[in-house]
């Protein structure tokens, strides 16, 4: 880890040193220097975007920007944006006044999906989060009747689990036990309110299905937890701290 931090330090020092030198180099074509900040003005080639109507940019009587008598931006008598007498946007005389009304905010489906994938905290459940949707596992129960019953009714069983952060549990068994209990309880209550009841066979199968999904959720959350811990260790190492301090010095200086 220390070797990695040292190599990162060397790489960023070389990069930012070059950028720091570039920032200190004088720029040609400054104010009152030989070069022009806007090549094309005052040269034989003319401006890349010549003004229309005979007037220069920002000059009166020729359609300049922000000046009267020429249809400038935001000025009367010339059809400016948002002003009367000229059919501006959102004002009298225009044909598109409704365009000035603010549009209603729309909920992004990507944001909703991202919240579900990351594990959204469920209100009223004491800090439990709802995991992302999973494919229901293929489970064999030991006899043809239950196997067939499961295949025909698996759509009635949960495909998401409720869980708490893994750092609140001492081991996987405690996480899975709590995850199974709260998930089956919530799913049963929700389904019962819709007028559907579960048999003992349904409960038995739900326990097996939810247990497999809770194990999968634990493995996923544990991996993410250890990755976050590794990142914290990396950024707390002395070489990385020195690197960050040096970058701040270059940016401020």
Swiss-Prot record:
Monomer and homodimer. Has a tendency to aggregate into amyloid fibrils containing a cross-beta spine, formed by a steric zipper of superposed beta-strands. Soluble oligomers may represent an intermediate stage on the path to fibril formation. Copper binding may promote oligomerization. Interacts with GRB2, APP, ERI3/PRNPIP and SYN1. Mislocalized cytosolically exposed PrP interacts with MGRN1; this interaction alters MGRN1 subcellular location and causes lysosomal enlargement. Interacts with APP. Interacts with KIAA1191. Interacts with ADGRG6. Its main location: membrane. It is found in: Cell membrane; Golgi apparatus. It comes from the Eukaryota. Sequence repeats lie at residues 51-59, 60-67, 68-75, 76-83, 84-91. One of its GO terms (molecular function) is copper ion binding. SMART domains: PRP. It is a lipid-anchor; GPI-anchor. GO terms for cellular component: Golgi apparatus; plasma membrane; side of membrane. The normal, monomeric form has a mainly alpha-helical structure. The disease-associated, protease-resistant form forms amyloid fibrils containing a cross-beta spine, formed by a steric zipper of superposed beta-strands. Disease mutations may favor intermolecular contacts via short beta strands, and may thereby trigger oligomerization. Belongs to the prion family. Cu(2+) 1 binds at residues 61-63. Cu(2+) 4 binds at residues 85-87. Residues 1-22 form the signal peptide. A lipid is attached at residue 230 (GPI-anchor amidated serine). This is Major prion protein. Residues 231-253 form a propeptide. Cu(2+) 3 binds at residues 77-79. Its primary physiological function is unclear. May play a role in neuronal development and synaptic plasticity. May be required for neuronal myelin sheath maintenance. May promote myelin homeostasis through acting as an agonist for ADGRG6 receptor. May play a role in iron uptake and iron homeostasis. Soluble oligomers are toxic to cultured neuroblastoma cells and induce apoptosis (in vitro). Association with GPC1 (via its heparan sulfate chains) targets PRNP to lipid rafts. Also provides Cu(2+) or Zn(2+) for the ascorbate-mediated GPC1 deaminase degradation of its heparan sulfate side chains. Residues 26-108 are annotated as: Disordered.
């Amino acid at each position: 880890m220390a070797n990695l931090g040292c190599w990162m330090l060397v790489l960023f020092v070389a990069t930012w040193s070059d950028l720091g030198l570039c920032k200190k180099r004088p720029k040609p074509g400054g104010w009152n220097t030989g070069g022009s900040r806007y090549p094309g003005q005052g040269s034989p080639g003319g401006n890349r975007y010549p003004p229309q109507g005979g007037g220069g940019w920002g000059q009166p009587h020729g359609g300049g920007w922000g000046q009267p008598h020429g249809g400038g931006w935001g000025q009367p008598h010339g059809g400016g944006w948002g002003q009367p007498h000229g059919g501006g946007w959102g004002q009298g005389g225009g044909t598109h006044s409704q365009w000035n009304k603010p549009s209603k905010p729309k909920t992004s489906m990507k944001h909703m999906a991202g919240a579900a994938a990351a594990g959204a905290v469920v209100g009223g459940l004491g800090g439990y989060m709802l995991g992302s949707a999973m494919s229901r596992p293929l489970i064999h129960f030991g006899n043809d009747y239950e196997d067939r019953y499961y295949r025909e009714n698996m759509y009635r069983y949960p495909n998401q689990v409720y869980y708490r952060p893994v750092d609140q549990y001492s081991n996987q068994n405690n996480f899975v036990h709590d995850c199974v209990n709260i998930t089956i309880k919530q799913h049963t209550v929700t389904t019962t309110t819709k007028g559907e009841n579960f048999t003992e066979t349904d409960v038995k199968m739900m326990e097996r299905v939810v247990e497999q999904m809770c194990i999968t959720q634990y493995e996923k959350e544990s991996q993410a937890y250890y990755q976050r811990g590794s990142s914290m260790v990396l950024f707390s190492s002395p070489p990385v701290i020195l690197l960050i301090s040096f970058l701040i010095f270059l940016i401020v200086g």
